[in-house]
Amino acid sequence: AAPYDELESGLDQIRRFDPSFNEESFKELVQDLFFRIQAGWMNRSIEGIESLLTVEMRDFFKGEFEKMRQQGRLNRLENIAVRKVELAEAWQEAGKDYVTVFFTANLLDYTVDDQTGQVVQGDKLNPVKFQEFWTFCRDAGGGSRWQLSAINQPGESLTRH
């Protein structure tokens, strides 16, 4: 995670254009988006989540869904319990606000064959710890909704660097 002052200065930039920006409300909002996007992922469908994703993420998801369909695979994410929602980075760039959130959750994550229902990957009984960085963006000043613009694993460099 970025040093506190770097994060704080990014949040200050966002607040300069949108004084109503509130960290706690933002965390609640993105946690809601997290659940909605995960549900879309499980359904292998962009329908209903399209407006929550940037064009690049839409294309990425569509590609992943196509691959899963071709392989006859369904990725199941169940009993999702979000443990922590932490702001990791915030900045403005090219007229947009960006905030990266570090999600820590426990969930059942397994993949089944969509013909037989047989588990081909993962474990449907033992929850795993899930940690990912999700970056959300919107027009500076709050003129548009927050959308998911990137997903990174811990250890990967974040998209902007």
What is each PLM-predicted segment?
Residues A2-V82, E86:
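Core segments of small alpha/beta cavity-forming domains
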Residues R73-Q115:
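Surface-exposed, charged secondary-structure patches
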